[in-house]
From Swiss-Prot:
EC number: 4.3.2.10
UniProt KW keywords: Amino-acid biosynthesis, Cytoplasm, Histidine biosynthesis, Lyase
Reaction catalysed by this enzyme: 5-[(5-phospho-1-deoxy-D-ribulos-1-ylimino)methylamino]-1-(5-phospho-beta-D-ribosyl)imidazole-4-carboxamide + L-glutamine = D-erythro-1-(imidazol-4-yl)glycerol 3-phosphate + 5-amino-1-(5-phospho-beta-D-ribosyl)imidazole-4-carboxamide + L-glutamate + H(+)
Function noted in UniProt: IGPS catalyzes the conversion of PRFAR and glutamine to IGP, AICAR and glutamate. The HisF subunit catalyzes the cyclization activity that produces IGP and AICAR from PRFAR using the ammonia provided by the HisH subunit.
Catalytic residue list: 11, 134
Annotated protein name in UniProt: Imidazole glycerol phosphate synthase subunit HisF
Organism: Methanococcoides burtonii (strain DSM 6242 / NBRC 107633 / OCM 468 / ACE-M)
Length: 273
């Protein structure tokens, strides 16, 4: 088993002070969690393998991403930084990488224009392009026989629908089919968030995480629902994810990154300590 990565995620929304990290349940009812640069430094010191910054209001409000927050963070933190939110063009990618990010995460723009993935990965390299896929369970399997039907933990059947604009708009796209297309187009990684689990503390959505991990060759970062180190463990063992992303458990001080890594190491999951 390859070394598993633990990645704190900072959902950032812009305010007068130049960025506030927020975390809500299913992207609504957002609670403030602190200054993004301070939190990034804290996670760096705790041994995070990477950081993800998502400007969660950017796509929705059509605002360009917060370059200054990226620059300040990149000056303080020396682990890989992925930035997403409102990235719609090659020029956006260029600006964010120039500001100090190592990778960009594309989501809504990739669904609207899949060739954007190919274009960006051709210019900057696949290793720089992470495609974020937000999905929701859809229990209407009767009328969706062309979709990838999976069995949920309770035996119910469902397919996973790709949603965009921060989870607000369903697309009709099947998550497994879309993920395969994204890989073909040149994305180097997939950041998979189940909206059914986001912020719930119920653990990762294992059926879809496992399916993508088995079907694709590129790394899958599991996201949405981590409440304790055991959830991270299940994401790696049952979900076969390459990396685990979490927000709430780190932001509100319930666990440090080191706590999670030590718990994983005690269960023989290879992590960098």
């Amino acid at each position: 088993m390859l070394t598993k990565r633990i990645i704190p995620c900072l959902d950032v929304t812009l305010d007068a002070s130049g960025g506030t990290v927020v975390k809500g349940v299913e992207f609504v009812d957002l609670k403030k969690a602190g200054d993004p640069v301070d939190l990034a430094k804290r996670y760096n010191e705790q041994g995070a393998d990477e950081l993800v910054f998502l400007d969660i209001t950017a796509s929705h409000e059509g605002r360009s991403t917060m370059i200054d927050v990226i620059e300040r963070t990149a000056n303080e933190v020396f682990i890989p930084l992925t930035v997403g939110g409102g990235i719609n063009s090659v020029e956006d990618v260029r600006q964010i990488l120039r500001a100090g990010a190592d990778k960009v995460s594309v989501n809504t723009a990739a669904v609207k224009n899949p060739e954007f993935i190919r274009e960006a990965s051709n210019i900057f390299g696949s290793q720089c392009i992470v495609t974020a896929i937000d999905c929701k369970r859809n229990l209407d399997v009767e009328n969706n026989q062309d979709k990838t039907i999976l069995e949920l933990e309770d035996g119910t059947l469902a397919w996973y629908e790709v949603v965009i604009y921060g989870g607000r708009e369903p697309t009709g796209l099947d998550t497994v089919q879309w993920a395969k297309k994204v890989e073909e187009l040149g994305s180097g990684e997939i950041l998979l968030t189940s909206m059914n689990r986001d912020g719930t503390y119920d653990g990762f959505d294992i059926p879809i995480t496992k399916k993508l991990s088995e079907e694709l060759d590129i790394p899958i970062i599991a996201s949405g629902g981590v409440g304790n180190p055991e959830h991270m463990y299940k994401g790696f063992v049952d979900g076969k994810a390459d990396a685990g992303l979490a927000a709430s458990i780190f932001h509100f001080g319930e666990y440090t990154v080191r706590d999670v890594k030590e718990a994983l190491r005690a269960k023989n999951i290879p992590v960098r300590l």
